[in-house]
A protein has these predicted regions:
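Generic signature of intrinsically disordered, low-complexity segments enriched in small/polar residues
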Residues: 12, 17, 21-24, 45, ...
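Vicinal oxygen chelate
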Residues: 35-96, 103
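Core segments of cupin and vicinal oxygen chelate
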Residues: 1-27, 67, 80
Length: 103
C-alpha cells in the first residue's frame, strides 16, 4: 500500500491522506483523516472516528437510506473546506459512515 495523495485543509484544521494499491479510478482507496490538535478521544473511543464510502449520488443515497429509517446526522451537501458532496449516516452502534460523491 502506498500514499496516493495528501491534502491539508487549514481552514478545517485537518489533513486527508489517501492510500491504496493503484489508481483510484480502478482500485479501492482508504481515506485517513488527521484532525490537528485532537487531544480528547472521540465519542466512541480512539480507534477511529468514521469510515467513508464513495457513492455515485450522495443526495439520492441519503433519500433511500432516510426512507429506510437510517439516522442521518449530517445531510447531503458540499463540504465546507473542499467542495466535495458528502453526508454522514450512523450505524446502530453510533459509528458514523461518511458518504462521499465520486467524481
Amino acid at each position: 500500500m502506498k500514499l496516493l495523495r495528501k491534502r491539508d485543509y487549514p481552514g478545517g484544521k485537518f489533513t486527508l491522506a489517501f492510500v491504496g494499491y493503484g489508481d483510484e479510478s480502478n482500485n479501492t482507496v482508504i481515506e485517513l483523516t488527521h484532525n490537528w490538535g485532537q487531544a480528547e478521544p472521540y465519542d466512541l473511543g480512539s480507534a477511529f472516528r468514521h469510515l467513508a464510502v464513495g457513492v455515485p449520488d450522495v443526495y439520492k443515497t441519503c433519500e433511500r437510506l432516510a426512507s429506510a429509517g437510517v439516522k442521518i446526522p449530517r445531510s447531503a451537501g458540499p463540504m465546507a473546506h473542499g467542495g466535495s458532496v458528502i453526508a454522514f449516516i450512523e450505524d446502530p452502534d453510533g459509528y458514523r459512515i461518511e458518504l462521499i460523491q465520486r467524481p
